């Protein structure tokens, strides 16, 4: 059973398994199982760590003519080592059990927690990007027109002034956000991030993730899809180390309001 995992029907597998699937998902699955997802963005740079090597450096699975076939070396270990086989199946079963709390009809589940690197995979990005490089948002030609936005609501007192943004909720539907430090509206990154917003023809899909503070670790709560409010983008500046630094502010509105219990856990105000 380990040689051929299953044959893709391409049409109908979503109905059989009740899961969200399209061509981008299938390509992403291939890249993860072949470990290409973990290659460095600049493969010619010898200083870039090849994360593929962390996972053995070999494809776990090969996808040929619509059939996923397990790597022969991996299959041999499973056939000849009962302890390894048991541990392998425990991991698979644990993953399936853990997946039951997620909405299988959508890439992301509102109210669940995700690390920035997990979101890379779930949004079908071509490569894994480190959380440090993603920062508060990330867009590139390899992110399939998606733009996840990450907000740490209460900033620690000892963090750098350059990342001490004053993001805040206006209400359970709307949030005021900031770009990364040093950005200008007329520059390439901001033009790409807000392309089509004022014309009502947004180019990107935006996803909002929030955590209360860094005490919660590296994961953020997914609050849902959102859109940048028309004409909300403003060029501003902040005084950092005695110098005025440019920054862009903008407002986003969620398609669905934040659950009130969760909302007040962020803003720190008790309901009457």
Language model features by range: what are they?
Residues 1-10, 14-15, 107-219:
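Acidic, glycine-rich low-complexity segments with interspersed aromatic residues
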Residues 1-87:
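C-terminal helical accessory/scaffold domains
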Residues 7, 11, 15, 25, ...:
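Short linear sequence elements within intrinsically disordered, low-complexity coil regions
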Residues 73-131:
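Extended alpha-helical interface modules used as scaffolds for assembling large macromolecular complexes
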Residues 213-272:
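Compact mixed alphabeta submodule
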Residues 19-21, 147-152, 250-254:
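Generic recognition of long tandem-repeat/solenoid scaffolds
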Residues 19, 97-102, 120, 147, ...:
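Generic recognition of cysteine residues
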């Amino acid at each position: 059973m380990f040689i051929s995992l299953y044959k893709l029907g391409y049409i109908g597998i979503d109905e059989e398994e009740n899961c969200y699937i399209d061509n981008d998902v299938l390509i992403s699955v291939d890249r993860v199982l072949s470990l290409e997802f973990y290659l460095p963005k600049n493969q010619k740079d010898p200083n870039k760590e090849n994360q593929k090597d962390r996972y053995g450096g070999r494809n776990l699975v090969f996808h040929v003519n619509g059939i996923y076939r397990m790597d022969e070396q991996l299959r041999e270990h499973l056939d000849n080592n009962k302890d390894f086989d048991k541990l392998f199946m425990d991991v698979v079963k644990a993953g399936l059990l853990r997946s039951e709390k997620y909405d299988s009809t959508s890439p992301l589940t509102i109210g669940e927690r995700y690390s920035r690197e997990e979101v890379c995979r779930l949004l079908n990005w071509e490569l894994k990007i480190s959380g440090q490089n993603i920062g508060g948002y990330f867009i590139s030609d390899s992110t399939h027109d998606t733009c996840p936005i990450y907000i740490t609501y209460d900033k620690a007192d000892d963090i750098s002034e350059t990342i001490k943004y004053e993001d805040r909720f206006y209400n359970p539907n709307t949030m005021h956000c900031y770009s990364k430090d040093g950005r200008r509206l007329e520059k390439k990154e901001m033009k790409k991030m807000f392309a089509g917003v004022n014309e009502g023809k947004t180019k990107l899909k935006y996803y909002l993730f929030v955590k209360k503070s860094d005490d919660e670790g590296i994961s953020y709560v997914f609050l849902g899809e959102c859109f940048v409010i028309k004409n909300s983008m403003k060029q501003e500046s902040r005084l950092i180390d005695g110098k005025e630094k440019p920054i862009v502010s903008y407002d986003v509105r969620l398609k669905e309001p934040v659950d009130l219990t969760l909302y007040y856990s962020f803003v720190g105000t008790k309901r009457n």
